[in-house]
Amino acid sequence: MNIQSLLGRTAIRMAPLLVLCATPALAQTDSIGDLISKSGVIGWAIIGVSIIALAVIIENFITLKRDKLAPPEVIEEIRGLFDDEQFQDAMEICENEPSFFTAVCGAGIGKIGHGYDVIEKSIEEMGDEESIRLHQKISWLSLISNVAPMMGLLGTVSGMVEAFNSIASSGGQASPAELAGGISKALLTTMFGLVVAIPVTASFAFLRNRMVRTIIETGAIIEDLFERFRPESN
């Protein structure tokens, strides 16, 4: 396992614990529930976004495995059928075993007999289409990693407005206790936004790199399968 993979897995597994570790001093006097309550509506919204992010991470961590995108047993079976020139049977497998590999390979099989250029174009088009679909699945993580800090910043501004309103309403004589609520909300929402954004960003990078690597490897396998249809140069 390389360093990048190890860091990605660690970020995904440790994401739920970051909130607990982010403010140990606060945790000594307030529970996590108390901190969330003090952060107000925006804090709860950030927590909701974090739950969505965790669900997306888990779902993609499972479905973007290489064995899911390009099942080795299916690859070997189709390779054997290609060697026996049983292309119709290979097409049936592609239709019955949905995956990135079978979708792209099936597009090429459907154009056998139309010339290598047509086959190659069909494979490239389906490969692009499937790649976009996979990118869309993890694009939510990129969105969340950008939105969460902005939500935290919004909470910060809201909290500071409350603090200054307290000063204004007291004629400039607001006590520290009166200011504490607004300032606390300002700091907590910023913290929650960053606590969500950091592991989500790491998870997005890990899943994206895994997906790109698998797409490249699968493309090489498919290219090798259809190489037999390439006309020999004179």
Where are these regions (language model features)?
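N-terminal secretory/membrane targeting signals
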Residues: 1-27
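Loop-to-transmembrane-helix entry motif
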Residues: 10, 39-43, 130, 134-148, ...
